[in-house]
Design a protein with these regions (language model features):
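Cytosolic juxtamembrane N-terminal segment immediately preceding the first transmembrane helix
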Residues: 2-45, 49
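Extracytoplasmic
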Residues: 37-68, 182-185
Length: 185
């Protein structure tokens, strides 16, 4: 009876069946390109997520100029809601990547950012939009704040220890640039 070895199973389109970034052969034969591509995608997404998360703080100061007549307290609540939502959703995001995978988390979180972005686009054009709708849109803007808790741990899994600091610095540094972008635009 002869023993035959099966060839290594190729990486699945959804799940990585083998991931060994510390193995130099694995890293140089495709692991590196997957890791850097994943870093690029999650960094762009994180930049957009931070922009969406802090968008409300940039919009609230302009709401009276477009016809909204909210009290200072109401405006502060609109500004606070994304932070409250983002902080709470970070607890959920901690478990998402290991449960459903980085690809699904990135896809779903990017799509979820469309709700506050499109919603606020239309809301600022119509001062008759009720306060509770703006409060809900502010909550959904907080979805971007939760992304940080999914992407940083995911990046930690993709890179060998010798490159981990560089990868995390790129992701956090460029990702946080989203805050500045939304304040300047």
């Amino acid at each position: 009876m002869s023993s035959t070895t099966k060839p290594a199973k190729p990486l699945s389109a959804t799940w990585l069946t083998r991931w060994e970034p510390e193995d130099p052969a694995f890293w140089s034969n495709g692991g590196s390109s997957i890791a850097w591509r994943t870093l690029a995608l999650t960094t762009v997404n994180l930049t957009l997520a931070f922009a969406a998360w802090f968008m409300v703080s940039a919009l609230v100061v302009r709401l009276p100029q477009v016809g909204y007549t909210f009290s200072a307290s109401q405006l502060f609540w609109l500004t606070a809601m994304p932070g409250l939502a983002g902080g709470t959703l970070r607890l959920v995001h901690m478990f998402l990547t290991p449960m459903v995978g980085t690809r699904h988390v990135v896809s779903l979180s990017t799509l979820s950012l469309l709700v506050p972005l499109v919603g606020w686009f239309f809301a600022v054009q119509d001062p008759s939009v009720p306060y509770w709708v703006l409060l809900l849109l502010s909550f959904f803007a907080g979805l971007g704040g939760g992304n940080f808790s999914s992407f940083m741990p995911s990046t930690s899994l993709f890179f060998p220890k010798r490159l981990l600091g560089t990868a995390l610095a790129i992701q956090a540094g460029i990702g946080n640039l989203g805050v500045s972008i939304v304040q300047f635009v």
